């Protein structure tokens, strides 16, 4: 007889005040270490070790902790073996019986919803609970107050499962990651490097247009000068001999040739400018794909609306998701919404001079939430660090407006809610 699926639809845990939590999501750990995952392995392991010193603590891994869509036969075991500090910190944290480790199933690690071997590995290694949603019930003098944790992909039609326990249920987003993107990357190579890390997946067309504009058209346009220079040289040498033979003075001949060649030069340049303008218009009009591609194109707006609905019609005081990779803490009427961000590379659009098409640059993001519950208030801090990866061409760097490139590890925002 098959073992019962240990993944709960909604895991509920009750805690007293004086409880501390760390919440993170979308770190996408795989079998191969990246610069972003190395950052995660180092920094989050430190935070978990610090949390282990508290009397009663909870680590909420709020979905897409593991990258089980991409890579060659990806597994939780391979990902954790490649990130030993992270693995060790969770093992040490789990040794305190008062501590809890909770894995909320996301879409990229959706296999945790049905894969028995990977479920059991997490349960046995970390004594972890696995669920599709986690509800934290806080006992207060005014009664129970609850906070709901979900990954958030159910609000994104392209990445939502109809039955998350069915191994044959594969959303459209999984097809893109496993089939479409690899084919595009293989065919185009370096031209579209970073497309799989787009911060705004629905900007796919604009990203490709930008790369073609800067890395193909503009970067090679200097080659058009060669025939112009050759033409000018030939016309000057041959033309001078013709005018001299006809009896014109050298001064007059030189003046006529210069005026003629300047006119020819600017005529050619005019044609080139006209062609460039037409190409620019075509590229700049590359349409953003429909907003339902990616996290509905609206970042956390749907999650914020759900948070307000939960607060209005239930006993919830807060709702926390991930999925969009957009960290956020927002005060709502009688409660809050928060997004735990990510720990990955994100390729983001940047403004340019002369209203040229936007360029794209890679940045390594790391975000997490720290929650402190005391007798009267619920405190939540958003920690973040951002490091820019210099992966632009010289031309892109010259035409990109300067902006804040990096951010040291710091508390980005704080919020308190009365219990």
Can you name each region flagged by the protein language model?
Residues 1-419:
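Extended recognition/assembly regions associated with phosphoester-bond processing machinery
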């Amino acid at each position: 007889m098959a073992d019962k699926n240990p993944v709960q639809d909604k895991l509920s845990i009750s805690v007293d005040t004086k409880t501390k939590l760390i919440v993170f999501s979308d770190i996408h750990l795989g079998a191969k270490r990246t610069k972003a995952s190395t950052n995660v392995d180092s920094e989050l392991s430190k935070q978990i070790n610090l949390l282990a010193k508290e009397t009663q603590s909870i680590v909420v891994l709020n979905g897409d902790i593991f990258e089980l869509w991409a890579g060659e036969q990806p597994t939780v075991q391979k990902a954790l073996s490649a990130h030993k500090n992270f693995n060790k910190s969770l093992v040490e944290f789990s040794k305190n019986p008062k501590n809890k480790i909770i894995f909320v199933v996301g879409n990229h690690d959706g296999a945790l919803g049905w894969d028995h071997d990977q479920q059991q590995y997490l349960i046995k290694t970390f004594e972890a609970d696995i669920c599709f949603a986690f509800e934290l019930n806080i006992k207060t003098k005014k009664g129970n107050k609850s906070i709901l944790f979900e990954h958030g992909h159910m609000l994104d039609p392209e990445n939502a499962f109809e039955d998350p326990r069915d191994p044959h249920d594969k959303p459209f987003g999984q097809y893109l990651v496993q089939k479409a993107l690899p084919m595009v990357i293989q065919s185009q190579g370096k031209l579209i490097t970073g497309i799989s890390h787009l911060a705004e997946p629905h900007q796919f067309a604009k990203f490709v247009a930008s790369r073609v504009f800067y890395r193909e058209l503009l970067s090679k346009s200097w080659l058009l000068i060669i025939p112009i220079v050759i033409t000018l040289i030939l016309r000057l040498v041959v033309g001078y001999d013709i005018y001299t033979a006809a009896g014109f003075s050298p001064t007059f001949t030189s003046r006529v040739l210069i005026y003629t060649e300047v006119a020819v030069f600017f005529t050619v340049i005019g044609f080139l400018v006209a062609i460039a303008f037409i190409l620019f218009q075509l590229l700049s009009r590359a349409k953003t794909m429909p907003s339902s591609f990616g996290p509905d194109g609206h970042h956390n707006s749907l999650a914020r609306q759900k948070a307000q609905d939960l607060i209005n019609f239930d006993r919830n005081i807060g709702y926390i998701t991930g999925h969009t990779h957009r960290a956020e803490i927002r005060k709502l009427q009688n409660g809050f919404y928060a997004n735990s961000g990510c720990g990955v590379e994100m390729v983001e659009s940047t403004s340019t001079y002369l209203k040229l098409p936007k360029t794209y640059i890679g940045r390594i993001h790391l975000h997490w939430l720290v929650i402190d519950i005391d007798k009267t208030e619920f405190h939540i801090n958003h920690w973040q660090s951002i490091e820019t990866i210099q992966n632009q061409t010289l031309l892109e760097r010259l035409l990109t407006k300067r902006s804040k490139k990096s951010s040291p590890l710091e508390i980005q925002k704080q919020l308190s809610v009365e219990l």
